[in-house]
């Protein structure tokens, strides 16, 4: 039986499985998935589940009896909060304060015999924000070359005509991507005041703090 991972180990980076246990039990089911989970390093032997298992080792509790017993105890518990057998179970580690109140601590997924620890809200939000920032910065880098300055209109943003992107590759040996890049560089731009309104407003706010170019 697993003794749990050391405190210094990042459990969110662990994928755990024990196929020989699953095979010996004839597959995973809702009735035995908590027992399977107890073999993993995510499990705590100081939990109420472990105490009840030791007390009833000669009279195994079914899932209904286990949940009923856990509700009468306070402390750390592991319960199934969602199931879609035979492929998915969601297990919650919680601190039960009383019969009607629990404090969720961590969520785990049992998916195709693999057990994962779900990331916390901070990690999930930080990752999403990092990805969004990267994509936004990449977009700004691409549109940075488009602004055109006019002393009467300020900064304007032209629209690329799709007709100028059609290139005949039948009589050339150059790759299609290279020809497309050349066509974009040599394309004829047309501007509509309604186009890129959001981008235009944002970019104008960036340029407003810069000194306008000298006009002779």
UniProtKB/Swiss-Prot annotation:
List the residue ranges forming a coiled coil, or say none: none
How does it associate, per the subunit comment? Component of the Mediator complex.
Q: What is this protein called?
A: Mediator of RNA polymerase II transcription subunit 6
Encoding gene, per UniProt annotation: med6
Q: Please report the organism this UniProt entry assigns to the protein.
A: Schizosaccharomyces pombe (strain 972 / ATCC 24843) (Fission yeast)
Q: What does this protein do?
A: Component of the Mediator complex, a coactivator involved in the regulated transcription of nearly all RNA polymerase II-dependent genes. Mediator functions as a bridge to convey information from gene-specific regulatory proteins to the basal RNA polymerase II transcription machinery. Mediator is recruited to promoters by direct interactions with regulatory proteins and serves as a scaffold for the assembly of a functional preinitiation complex with RNA polymerase II and the general transcription factors.
Per UniProt, subcellular location reads as: Nucleus
InterPro entries linked = Mediator_Med6, Mediator_Med6_fun, Mediator_Med6_sf
Q: What is the lineage of its organism?
A: Eukaryota, Fungi, Dikarya, Ascomycota, Taphrinomycotina
Example of a GO biological process term = regulation of transcription by RNA polymerase II
Select a single GO molecular function from the record's annotations and give it: transcription coactivator activity
State the UniProt keywords alphabetically.
Activator, Nucleus, Transcription, Transcription regulation
């Amino acid at each position: 039986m697993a003794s749990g991972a050391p405190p210094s180990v990042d459990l969110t980076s662990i994928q755990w499985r024990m196929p020989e246990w699953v095979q010996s039990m004839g597959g995973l089911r809702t009735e035995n998935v908590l027992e399977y989970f107890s073999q993993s390093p995510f499990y705590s032997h100081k939990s109420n589940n472990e105490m009840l298992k030791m007390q009833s080792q000669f009279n195994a509790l079914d899932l209904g009896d286990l949940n009923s017993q856990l509700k009468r105890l306070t402390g750390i518990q592991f319960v199934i909060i969602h199931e879609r057998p035979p492929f998915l179970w969601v297990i919650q580690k919680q601190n039960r304060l009383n019969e009607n109140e629990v404090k969720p601590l961590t969520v785990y997924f049992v998916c195709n015999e693999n057990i994962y620890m779900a990331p916390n809200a901070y990690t999930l939000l930080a990752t999403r924000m990092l990805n969004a920032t990267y994509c936004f910065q990449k977009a700004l880098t691409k549109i940075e070359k488009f602004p055109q300055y006019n002393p009467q209109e300020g900064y304007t943003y032209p629209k690329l005509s799709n007709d100028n992107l059609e290139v005949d590759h039948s009589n050339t040996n150059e790759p299609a991507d290279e020809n497309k890049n050349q066509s974009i560089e040599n394309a004829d731009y047309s501007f509509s005041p309604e186009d890129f309104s959001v981008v235009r407003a944002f970019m104008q706010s960036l340029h407003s703090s810069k000194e306008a170019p000298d006009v002779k």
